[in-house]
């Protein structure tokens, strides 16, 4: 246990403090660290010091205890979509409420898979939520097989969905007029 959880913390911290500033200064991009699961205990402190956004996912530890230096998401490509995470297939109004919670979080960014946005419209989302998953790492025959069932024109022309999405974003004050 000591080998995995504490013996190498100082090693990882020193190396991160040496390498990260140079990497971060090489670009003007905002950095986000994938800090989910088993990570050395020094990681949150190093990320905060370097102003690297942490990743916050629905159902993961510390849900709802997010600060501004984070990206919140309903799921990732390796997880179940929002509809799949629920015991029963949620109605569009329930999906709206769940997305609203994320949009109202203090996280700097809120990023959702397209499947979760489409779940706001019963006619546009897939009929079976089990078909929405992008990747299932535990299944060697299910790698990256997801294909969107709509073309971009159908999404662009879905005025009700687009009005709903724009309203959620504007009402959460994540919308900036330029």
Q: Could you tell me what each predicted segment is?
A:
Residues 1-178:
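Catalytic cores of glycan-processing enzymes that make or break glycosidic bonds
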